[in-house]
Curated annotation (Swiss-Prot):
Quaternary structure (record): tRNA splicing endonuclease is a heterotetramer composed of sen2, sen15, sen34 and sen54. Interacts directly with sen2.
Taxon lineage: Eukaryota, Fungi, Dikarya, Ascomycota, Taphrinomycotina
Family matches, as Pfam families: tRNA_int_end_N2
Keywords attached to this entry: tRNA processing
Official protein name in the record: Probable tRNA-splicing endonuclease subunit sen54
GO biological process: tRNA-type intron splice site recognition and cleavage
Organism: Schizosaccharomyces pombe (strain 972 / ATCC 24843)
């Protein structure tokens, strides 16, 4: 989930062309015969770009558009023995599959004593949306995709939760719901808080203090005076380099202590999903430590987390037992890290937050081979 170097848009400006901006030529789909039960994926043809005003281009676009709609209108057929039918249980808020088969159920659903597979709302909606399963009501009526959406989304916690779940599943991850996911059956969108006069007053005073801190009143009063360049160090006399680096530290390093996990149901930032990388040894009955812990938030009703909210989020995450050997990898991942999935009107962005303690004193490590550095004498004085 980390950004790769080849994804950098500035590495090769000549070859970064978005093919989705081009109008596709869908006329090759007209070769698909509707009366056949099996289809083969046809080869892609040439692309038709924006209309240029000519009748030839207009006719080509009409034929391409008609071929696309004709291909979408083809009735998809499936044999009865391969069909997966689920029954929606409104009382439990889950769907039940009597006969589950296929590789998808290796990472989805929970089996009971009667060998029935129970699916969570997001799992049910994902399988119905991708066309792998049909969902029926308890009355024996087939449910449309819109009906499954209306029944499942409130039980998923929010629409953003399902969007992130479906995206991770399409990327190949095995996604397990965390026990901390909030479920709101009636209304799953929080209204924004209305600020009163007291809140506005403190907000104005805070903004005013920030503006005043940016001014240099001494320079405004004496614009032509020359001042001696000051050091960023607090002291003037040092005897070792360790004292210099210790004085330069703004936030002191610390060693994390393993303690009981603290969870808070009031915070907007909570672990929503546990994501696992694709692996043949993955078992739902014996889950290991997840590769990623996902916290889903909406950009429309959620502000930037405060330091207290981030600390509470880290407090609900256990410490890593095996740290990476590479120093920069340890700085990147930290003792614990969380992926914040920000959903902005369907557009998902992932941000990693890591608990990096900076407890390693790299300036005292001179054990590398080939290094000509030596320890400084303790009589080193007057470093400014």
């Amino acid at each position: 989930m980390d950004a790769q170097d080849e994804d950098n848009p500035f590495t090769n400006l000549e070859t970064t062309v978005d093919v989705t901006e081009e109008i596709q030529d869908w006329r090759f789909l007209s070769n698909v015969e509707k009366d056949q039960g099996t289809y083969t994926i046809p080869k892609r043809g040439q692309k038709d770009f924006e209309p240029d005003g000519t009748n030839k281009q207009h006719s080509a676009l009409d034929l391409s558009r008609k071929a696309m709609f004709d291909a979408l209108s083809v009735e998809r057929l499936i044999s009865a023995k391969h069909a997966i039918i689920a029954t929606w249980n409104a009382q439990n808020g889950m769907s039940c599959v009597e006969k589950a088969h296929g590789p998808l159920f290796k990472t989805m659903g929970t089996a009971d004593s009667q060998n029935r597979m129970w699916l969570l709302p997001e799992e049910t909606l994902y399988l119905v949306e991708r066309g792998s399963m049909e969902c029926w009501s308890e009355e024996g009526l087939p449910m449309s995709l819109q009906a499954v959406y209306s029944a499942s989304i409130p039980l998923c916690g929010s629409l953003e939760n399902y969007l992130v779940y479906a995206h991770l599943r399409r990327c190949g991850f095995s996604v397990i719901r965390s026990n901390l996911v909030p479920v709101k059956e009636d209304e799953y969108r929080c209204d924004s808080k209305i600020m009163n006069f007291k809140d506005l007053l403190f907000l104005g005073l805070g903004k005013a203090s920030q503006i005043l801190q940016t001014f240099n009143f001494r320079k405004l009063a004496f614009p032509f005076s020359k001042r001696r360049r000051q050091s960023i160090l607090l002291h003037d006399t040092f005897y070792t380099y360790e004292e210099v680096y210790h004085d330069l530290q703004i936030v002191r390093g610390y060693v994390p202590i393993a303690c009981n996990l603290i969870t808070s149901s009031d915070s907007l930032f909570q672990i929503t999903f546990h994501a696992y990388k694709p692996s043949a040894s993955f078992k739902k009955s014996a889950l290991s430590e997840p590769d990623f812990r996902i916290c889903v938030v909406s950009s429309q009703d959620t502000l930037l987390p405060t330091i207290f909210e981030i600390d509470a989020l880290f407090s609900s995450t256990p410490l890593r037992q095996n740290m990476p050997q590479h120093m920069f990898q340890r700085l990147k991942e930290g003792y614990r890290n969380i992926i914040i999935a920000i959903v902005d009107y369907g557009v998902i962005s992932y941000i990693r937050l890591s608990d990096v303690c900076f407890e390693e004193k790299v300036y005292t490590d001179f054990s590398k081979k080939g290094s000509k550095r030596k320890r400084v004498s303790k009589k080193f004085q007057q470093l400014v």
